[in-house]
């Protein structure tokens, strides 16, 4: 585990995802030695640099105890990097997790449930991020709708944490880095 102020230096290769076809983003998988220095096996927000350009992002769990990172087109262009290149990273876990972006459908549901909204407003940013992650990780629209309803009911009852899901993907094998496009 690392202290919030410790800078993690490493290198990783930029990969093009196999799906969706024609994706504008790339990704990289952190070396395990770098991931092990992070404070958690699940999502963790960091600041730092990629190829010398500033970055603020949330690393995603790769389901193997490590992490992966999306590199959006704007950062690719600013850094002058492309798929296949190895880039230097300098990452520092943030001292306080940023507020997550609430999906529109969840936002509407919370607005319609004052008791759920009251609990939502009282929980930490990490807890809100976990609820959002649980809701959006459903593969089907029907599952997502059920999870929104369940989340609102649980929040309204005072439940502060989404439970019963593996935040790292290591045990459930439900999370993974994208599959790289074949060369």
Language-model regions, residue ranges each:
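Basic- and aromatic-enriched surface patches that contact anionic nucleotides/nucleic acids
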Residues: 126
């Amino acid at each position: 585990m690392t202290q919030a102020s410790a800078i993690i230096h490493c290198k990783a290769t930029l990969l093009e995802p196999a799906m969706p076809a024609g994706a504008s983003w790339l990704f990289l998988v952190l070396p395990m030695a770098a991931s092990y220095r992070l404070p958690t096996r699940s999502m963790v927000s960091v600041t730092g640099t990629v190829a010398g350009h500033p970055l603020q992002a949330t690393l995603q769990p790769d389901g193997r105890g490590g992490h992966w990172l999306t590199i959006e087109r704007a950062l690719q262009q600013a850094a002058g990097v492309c798929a296949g290149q190895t880039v230097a990273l300098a990452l520092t876990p943030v001292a306080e997790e940023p507020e997550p972006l609430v999906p529109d459908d969840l936002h509407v549901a919370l607005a319609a449930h004052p008791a759920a909204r009251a609990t939502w407003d009282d929980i930490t940013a990490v807890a809100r991020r976990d609820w959002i992650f649980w809701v959006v990780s459903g593969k089907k629209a029907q599952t997502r709708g059920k999870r929104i309803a369940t989340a609102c009911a649980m929040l309204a009852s005072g439940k502060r944490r989404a439970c019963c899901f593996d935040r790292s993907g290591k045990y459930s094998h439900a999370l993974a880095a994208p599959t790289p496009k074949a060369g």
